[in-house]
Amino acid sequence: MERNTPKKAVHFGAGNIGRGFVACFLHESGYEVIFAEVNDATVSKLNTHKSYKVIEVGAEGTTEKTITNYRAINSRSNEAALVEEIATADVVTCSVGPNILKFLAPVIAKGLAARSTDLTPAAVIACENAIGATDTLAEFIKSPENTNPALLEDYDKRATFANSAIDRIVPAQDPDAGLDVKLEKFYEWVVEKTPFKEWAVPDIKGIKWVDNLQPFIERKLYTVNTGHATAAYYGYTRRKSTVYDALQDKDIRDEVKNALKETADLITEKHGIDEEEQKQYVDKIVRRISNPHLEDAVERVGRAPLRKLSRKERFIGPAAELAENGKDCSALLDAAEMAFRFQNVEGDDESFELAKIMEEKKPEEVVQEVCGLQPSEKLYPQVVDIVKRVQADSNEE
């Protein structure tokens, strides 16, 4: 079944990923983009300036794209207008951070409840660095506090929820850049097509549609995000300013490669990915995060250490699986230790919260609370030892 025309997309989060990655592809695919954003200044800028530039940087030079045909709505103060837009949108996307998804659910639920079941179902795609982010969002939307259970009987006529994996490095921006966004040329946006069943998938350039997303999500999270964060946390402890600077240090580069060798062992065995193919993927990732044009500060890449040390994230996720299988995960644990040392970093609330937890709690409590590991898991005692070591060093300082 064909989709509606003219095409309209609602995107939550007008940050760098929202403007520079998701909205760029939606615009190039002929959608009008309505940004849903809570920052008044950003909403005002988007509604005042009728275009902005997306600047792609790489070793082979720079390209610029101009984005137009968009509007912005303050999702906090103008909910009614946003509900109307969602009720008639073809696509609803977001890039707000996994922890914010629960706050989007009420307004999306209202928009979908107001939607005619005669329309093609809205394609809802969360573009977050988290496994199963769209499933998480869907659970919040369909919960009784947000949606009348009676509506769920034919909810597939209102919305199709599809998980995605996104991969693009967007560094901190020049403070004078305004709405313009600088990012790397490389990108990957993979979305599962199976939820669409008899409906046509949305016509969006840049998306690779697949039947099974899990290998793509885990390969990306456990290679790009693991590698990027490992470089940042080692770089921070060794007083490097950018990820590029960190990777010029042979010791740090070796630590990154060792961590990615361990995740490669997991990925190739678990998902049947060819070892040589994964090796080439790893080499490409190391080159990407070594891009001097990105000027990516270690503090930016390392921010939110509590999330990055959590159970399904880039260090503990793969390390726990490797440990259960009796495989080596020592480099991942060393990287996790560096993440535990990312404390009291200016501009990052989670790093202050981590410092407080490390100061006030017993090692076993820290591991269960921060990493979500249970004493029955093989990785548990090894992470307890890391926390003890970091706490001991903090007490000596």
Curated annotation (Swiss-Prot):
GO terms for cellular component: cytosol. The keyword NAD applies. Signal peptide: none annotated. Pfam families: Mannitol_dh (PF01232), Mannitol_dh_C (PF08125). The keyword Oxidoreductase applies. GO terms for molecular function: mannitol-1-phosphate 5-dehydrogenase activity. It comes from the Eukaryota. GO terms for biological process: mannitol catabolic process. Keywords: NAD, Oxidoreductase. NAD(+) binds at residues 9-20. The active site is at residue 220. Its EC number is 1.1.1.17. It catalyses: D-mannitol 1-phosphate + NAD(+) = beta-D-fructose 6-phosphate + NADH + H(+). Catalyzes the NAD(H)-dependent interconversion of D-fructose 6-phosphate and D-mannitol 1-phosphate in the mannitol metabolic pathway. Monomer. Belongs to the mannitol dehydrogenase family. This is Mannitol-1-phosphate 5-dehydrogenase. It comes from Podospora anserina (strain S / ATCC MYA-4624 / DSM 980 / FGSC 10383) (Pleurage anserina).
